[in-house]
UniProtKB/Swiss-Prot annotation:
InterPro entries linked to this entry: aa-tRNA-synt_IIb, aa-tRNA-synth_II, aa-tRNA-synth_II/BPL/LPL, Anticodon-bd, Anticodon-bd_dom_sf, Thr-tRNA-ligase_IIa, ThrRS_core
Cofactor(s) the protein needs: Zn(2+)
Reactions this protein catalyses: tRNA(Thr) + L-threonine + ATP = L-threonyl-tRNA(Thr) + AMP + diphosphate + H(+)
GO CC term, one of those recorded: cytoplasm
Keyword vocabulary terms for this entry: Aminoacyl-tRNA synthetase, ATP-binding, Cytoplasm, Ligase, Metal-binding, Nucleotide-binding, Protein biosynthesis, RNA-binding, tRNA-binding, Zinc
Molecular function per GO: ATP binding; metal ion binding; threonine-tRNA ligase activity; tRNA binding
Function statement: Catalyzes the attachment of threonine to tRNA(Thr) in a two-step reaction: L-threonine is first activated by ATP to form Thr-AMP and then transferred to the acceptor end of tRNA(Thr). This protein is probably not able to deacylate mischarged L-seryl-tRNA(Thr) as it lacks the appropriate domain.
One example of a Gene Ontology biological process annotation: threonyl-tRNA aminoacylation
Cofactor notes: Binds 1 zinc ion per subunit.
Compartments reported by the entry: Cytoplasm
Pfam families from the UniProt entry: HGTP_anticodon, tRNA-synt_2b
Annotated binding of Zn(2+), by residue: 112, 166, 310
Protein name in the entry: Threonine--tRNA ligase catalytic subunit
Length: 471
């Protein structure tokens, strides 16, 4: 096992049982897991499932509360869809194509063509009653080809999930919409993940086309690209004016359909400065033309200009988790932690041990019934230090609850809550009358920890599990 200083996100993901380690062996077969899953396709494990489902729930409700329509689209489509969108012409080498009964299909590399079809369907049914801007959100799975040599852990994969949304917006409102998306990104990063968004931690990269390759690698005309890039430059300037976040420009890094703002997190780790790309906001003037949105919107809404904003607040969920695990050294916010409460029964070898065990068991069951992910660990006075070191270096629960003879006698629980901002545990003394009272008081601690999440999505997700075997 790597030391704390040498650990990568792969080590942390394995310790927390978030993912299966590809090079570990499958029992009986004596072959690596990657032999069966394939390179670049992460297999999320028991600790990773709750993270993904909880994150999906928070993000879906957050977006719904902000006027997005939550959708789900198929994983495959006829290549006729991707011919219209331009993916076959400009993105074919990054796609997985296959034949079904003589017809060519593709595993979707992006969600945008499907989202545009949904808009066209709603316009056909409801015409100008449909609101503009029209916003759809999907916690959507996509697949893109990556050379085997570039695949690495969760950071570079072939199959990944995006917190993906598309906004169909009249031309005069593009800059306001782009700025609003940045504010949404800031809310999610700060309230759910405790990541400060400031001039010290973030910068904005305006990724532009290479004008010499327009028509070859980038769709559209030079004039369209220059207009779109200027609109994003103005939106980025507004972000800079309010938050002081620096803007850099990079030629040739745009998407094939339009320029984009990429948000780069800067972190200092072991004296080494690292930059990680997080979310993205992309300006698209090509797909509206290819799907004839200009004609539809002009006819139904009387609007001459319409564009599409592609945006992902976190980007690739897999990549984001990899970066976050490395940055936070395996610590997760309470809402997403695989183990939210670890109940540690510290036995003494005396008659009180039965009371200690009964109380620990009752508290764990009560927390589980309330929807929390819980683990119970039996320990002793002599083995406690070793057990705590093991727990903190592997499972890393969000909250540790210690129950020993003193806690039983004095009716006060010894609770240690991990704080992501200080990266230390803070100690709480939680008084209780009986086990049910202890459960309610611990649930109140959880509600306080989840308060920022509730401000995003209205409520905190509850995905219970008994993970005692992990300790």
């Amino acid at each position: 096992m790597a030391s704390g200083q040498d650990k990568t996100h792969i080590d942390y993901a394995y310790e927390l049982d978030i993912t299966v380690k590809p090079d570990s062996r499958v029992p009986v077969f004596n072959r690596e897991f990657a032999t069966f899953t394939g390179a670049g396709v992460p297999l999320f494990s028991l600790g990773g499932g709750p993270i993904r489902y909880a994150l999906a729930e928070v993000l879906a409700k957050f977006h719904a509360r902000r006027g997005y329509y939550v959708v789900e689209t198929p994983i495959i489509a006829s290549t006729e869809l991707f011919k219209v969108s331009g993916h076959i012409e400009f993105y074919r080498n990054n796609m997985y194509l296959f034949d079904i009964e003589g017809h060519e299909f593709a595993v979707k590399p992006m969600n945008c063509p499907y989202h545009i079809l949904l808009f066209l369907n709603e316009v056909a049914k409801h015409r100008s009653k449909l609101p503009l801007p029209f916003k759809v959100f999907e916690f959507g799975r996509v697949h893109r080809y990556e050379p085997s040599g570039s695949i690495y852990g969760l950071l570079r994969v072939r199959g990944f999930t995006q917190d993906d949304a598309h906004i169909i917006v009249p031309g005069g409102r593009v800059i306001d919409v782009v700025y609003d998306v940045f504010e949404e990104m800031k809310l999610v990063l700060e309230r759910l993940f405790k990541l400060g968004v400031s001039s010290e931690t973030f910068k904005v990269r305006l990724s532009m086309s290479d004008k010499s390759l327009i028509g070859k690698e980038f769709m559209g005309s030079k004039e369209e690209w220059e207009g779109a890039e200027e609109a994003l430059r103005e939106a980025a300037s507004r972000i800079n004016e309010k938050y002081g976040i620096d803007i850099v420009e990079l030629e040739g890094e745009a998407a094939f359909y339009g320029p984009k703002l990429d948000f780069i997190m800067m972190v200092e780790e072991s004296g080494v400065s690292k930059e990680w790309q997080m979310g993205t906001i992309q300006f698209d003037f090509n797909l509206p033309r290819r799907f004839r949105l200009y004609d539809v919107v002009r006819e139904e809404f009387g609007i001459e200009e319409v564009y599409i904003i592609h945006r992902a607040l976190l980007g690739s969920i897999e990549r984001f988790l990899g970066v976050y695990l490395e940055h936070r050294r395996g610590r997760m916010p309470f809402t997403l932690a695989p183990i939210q409460f670890a109940v540690i029964a510290v036995k003494t070898g005396g008659e009180v041990d039965r009371e200690i065990e009964d109380l620990a068991s009752s508290i764990a069951k009560g927390l589980l019934d309330k929807g929390f992910r819980v683990a119970v660990k039996g320990s002793s006075k002599t083995g406690l230090s070793s057990d705590v070191r093991h727990i903190e270096s592997t499972a890393k629960p969000a909250v540790n609850v210690f129950i020993g003879a003193k806690e039983v006698r004095e009716k006060v629980l010894d609770v240690r809550v991990f704080d992501l901002e200080s990266m230390k545990r803070r100690r709480l003394a939680i008084a209780y009358g009986d086990a049910a009272d202890a459960v309610e008081n611990l649930a109140a601690v959880a509600e306080e920890l989840e308060s920022p999440v509730r401000s995003l999505s209205g409520q905190a997700p509850r995905i219970p599990a008994d993970f005692s075997f992990m300790l």
